Amino acid sequence: MESADSAGKGSTEQSESQRQSQMDRLDREEAFYQFVNNLNEDDYRLMRDNNLLGTPGEITKEELLRRLQQIKEGPPQPSTEGTRGDPVSASGDPAEDSSNGDSIIDWLNSVRQTGNTTRSGQRGNQSWRAVSRTNPNSGDFRFSLEINVNRTSGNPSMPSLEQSSEMPGAEDMEVSSQGENENEPEPVAPRVAQAEVTEEAPVQRGQRRARSRSPDQRRTRARTDRSRSPLHQAVEPPIRRAQHSSSQTVDASSTEEAEGSSRTRHHVSSQMQNSSSSNETEGSSRTRQHITARQQALGTEGQSQSQTQTQSQSQTQTQSQTQSQSTVHLSNPESRSSSQPPQTDSSSNAETTGTGQRPPTIVLDLQVRRVRPGDYRQRDSIANRTRSRSQTPNNTVTYESERGGFRRTFSRSERAGVRTYVSTIRIPIRRILNTGLSETTSVAIQTMLRQIMTGFGELSYFMYNDNDTDPNNPTPVSPPAAVPGEAQNLVSPEPPAPIVEPPEPVAPVESEEGSNVSTSSARREGRNSRGGVTFEESGSLPFLSLAQFFLLNEDDDDQPRGLTKEQIDNLSTRNFGENDALKTCSVCITEYTEGNKLRKLPCSHEYHVHCIDRWLSENSTCPICRRAVLVAGNRESIV
């Protein structure tokens, strides 16, 4: 009897607590609807676009008021001037430096509240820097992630020197392009994401290198400023040219503040004097690729003439250094039209005229350039150099596919000993990005990351296959993931870690920038059969945390189902009327009251504005009749 009484008493207390919890939730829901109904149109859109409304019943009215005040006051700006002028933050500021890879997840969680943020970190020889730019009014979202991997075998002090001189340039380029994007709608050239792998035979001591080039280099830069000829620009060392090609549009004011060491000052002066001539080379991304390839080829030829054959071979045996930089830029297509390959650009213009105002579309360009210094030693004669400059890119291989709304273009070309791999992916965003970066169900963010990682994997596949082909007779290779067009294949949550192959006496390239990302079992089998491939610190790059955080898996539908903010806002709205007293919203099952705002769908069904907006961000049909809110032609957002 006593046990039965105690059990009954416990169940009564449990049911009472559940009843109280339900009552509290109902009170919070009522307060939520009251708060939303009292918001004006601007405040409502501000909170909705920044994902601050949350779920009814799970957030109190006081918390909603606090969020509204916080977003109105504005987030603490990351001070663009401070980012430009402080070279310390580029190489990992102590306040932002974090050895924990999960810190980038915290940064992503704060994007929806802070708007524009910058975060950087470093772990061992790998450093990363992430920049977010959001515009709640237009819906544009730009996410840039730079991953720098420095590996050396020999002098352990060289990575820090090279990083201190390279990272400020990369950061200045990023900030400069951001500023131009906000002030002018004109496209900016350096938004093409580049990953350059340059391998050379450097001198054995960094001090010796600085002394040997200072007098001749200054005279060469003076001649370059006068003549603006690519022949005179080419005498910079390959690593310096890699920096110059990735930050050609750095303005003089930003680079002056980045002076720190003597090595950095040499790099800054080179950028300042070459900034005028670099503007002439900005046409299309393909034109810039060929000009950069020609400069790199001629520069290595000049170096090989100034050094003897024995010196070059002995330096190659004693020391080798590889620097890899991977930058991913996601931006609005209107500001990226000039930096896209011609195949995608022509189709973009054709669709632009037919659709009118479009929602934001993310364009992702991934470029990997692999320089093979061994090829340059065979081009020491004037005849060979002339032939390499005049040859046409007749060995370009291009593959284009479209499936599930994703247009993907792959191309591989070789000119003057420089192989360029380009993967362009156009990602339409048909749903609102304000579903929250902190929610693992964000299909849009999952799709973006999957496409980024797949792009790295396909470029890596290109480079793997080209290792076994003759450089003089390349064969067309199509990535296995692109042949069937399977955009929803499983992507393993692994980062684009650097791939290191065992050194061979014949092949001069020993490292590549790619991705340990498999999009099919065939690719995994192909990579495993090669053998001898090792991955260094695969878990230390932020992409591992990103992939795990967003739970990338093949069960998600790559085709976004919801409507964009612009499409939702174009639907008609009205205020509560006398005839609405006994009507009920079918989403929240709540009667309309005085002060409610109602949104009317084309099928004539009406709902609370905040209720139907949340529904339409995930769906494109009416909750009652299941009719499409927009016709297929109006929902098309591929540009």
UniProtKB/Swiss-Prot annotation:
Compartments in which it is found: Nucleus
Q: Which molecular-function annotation in GO is an example for this chain?
A: ubiquitin-protein transferase activity
Q: Which UniProt keywords apply?
A: Developmental protein, Metal-binding, Nucleus, Transferase, Ubl conjugation pathway, Zinc, Zinc-finger
Q: One of this protein's Pfam families, by short name?
A: zf-RING_2
Any idea of its EC number? Answer: 2.3.2.27
Q: Where is the composition biased (Basic and acidic residues)?
A: 213-228, 372-382
Q: Which GO terms describe its biological process?
A: embryonic axis specification; protein ubiquitination; ubiquitin-dependent protein catabolic process
Q: Which reaction does it catalyse?
A: S-ubiquitinyl-[E2 ubiquitin-conjugating enzyme]-L-cysteine + [acceptor protein]-L-lysine = [E2 ubiquitin-conjugating enzyme]-L-cysteine + N(6)-ubiquitinyl-[acceptor protein]-L-lysine
> Where is this protein primarily located?
nucleus
Which region ranges are annotated with the description Disordered?
A: 1-28, 67-403, 467-534
Q: For the motif PDZ-binding, what are the positions?
A: 636-639
Can you tell me which residues the record assigns to a coiled coil? Answer: none
Q: Which family does it belong to?
A: Belongs to the RNF12 family.
Listed name of the protein:
E3 ubiquitin-protein ligase RNF12
* Source organism: Xenopus tropicalis (Western clawed frog)
Q: What is the lineage of its organism?
A: Eukaryota, Metazoa, Chordata, Craniata, Vertebrata
